[in-house]
A protein has these predicted regions:
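Substrate-binding cleft and catalytic face of glycoside hydrolase catalytic domains
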Residues: 1-121, 145, 152
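Extracellular glycoside hydrolase catalytic/binding regions
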Residues: 109-111, 115-173
C-alpha cells in the first residue's frame, strides 16, 4: 500500500492566522487541523457558503492525470499548480512507474476538511476526493484498491447541529 503522507512544516513564531482563533498557527500541527479560515463554527467562516468551493478548489488544484508523465522509470509534471491533486497524482504515477501497488491511499485524517459544506449542503472536499480517487484509479488500474483512511472521529459521520442531526458525509467516497 502506498500512503502519501501530509506533514505540515509550520515553525513556531510563524505569524500565520490560526483558523481556531489563536494568535498564530501552532508549530508542526497535525494534518487534521487543515481547515478553512476562520474555522467551521467561527464568525466569518466560509463553511456553509459558496465561497468554500473556491477555497477547496484552491487547495486541491487543477492537476489532471494527463499533466503527469511517466517515462523511463521517471515521473515529470507539466501542470500549472502544486495543489493536493498534484501531490497525490504524482505519487500514483511513481507507483505506476515502479510496477504498480495493491493499494493506494488518497489521504488520511483530513477531518478539518471533509465536513465542510457549501451553500447547497454538499461536501466539496469529499467530492474532490471522489474525483481524485477516480483519477488515481485511472492511473493505477482497476486491480488497485484506492481509498481514503478516515480519522476515528469521521467514521460515525458528521453531527452538524441538533439532536439526531447526523450526516454520513464520507459515504460517497
Amino acid at each position: 500500500v502506498l500512503y502519501p503522507f501530509v506533514l505540515l512544516d509550520i515553525p513556531a513564531g510563524n505569524g500565520l492566522p490560526d483558523p481556531e482563533g489563536g494568535d498564530e498557527q501552532p508549530p508542526l500541527p497535525w494534518r487534521g487541523r487543515i481547515t478553512c479560515i476562520p474555522a467551521r463554527g467561527r464568525a466569518g467562516s466560509p463553511n456553509g457558503t459558496a465561497a468554500i468551493r473556491d477555497d477547496i478548489d484552491a487547495l486541491c488544484g487543477t492537476t489532471i492525470p494527463a499533466d503527469i508523465h511517466v517515462a523511463d522509470n521517471s515521473v515529470s509534471w507539466s501542470g500549472g499548480d502544486d495543489g493536493y491533486r498534484r501531490m497525490i497524482l504524482h505519487h500514483a504515477a511513481l507507483a505506476q512507474a515502479a510496477g504498480g501497488v495493491d493499494g493506494f491511499l488518497i489521504g488520511s485524517e483530513l477531518r478539518g476538511l471533509t465536513p465542510l459544506t457549501d451553500d447547497t449542503g454538499a461536501y466539496p472536499f469529499v467530492k474532490a476526493l471522489c474525483d481524485l480517487a477516480a483519477d488515481v484509479k485511472a492511473i493505477l488500474g482497476s486491480e488497485t484498491v484506492v481509498t481514503y483512511a478516515a480519522d476515528w472521529s469521521e467514521y460515525w459521520g458528521y453531527q452538524s447541529g441538533g439532536p439526531g442531526d447526523v450526516a454520513f458525509h464520507l459515504d460517497a467516497l
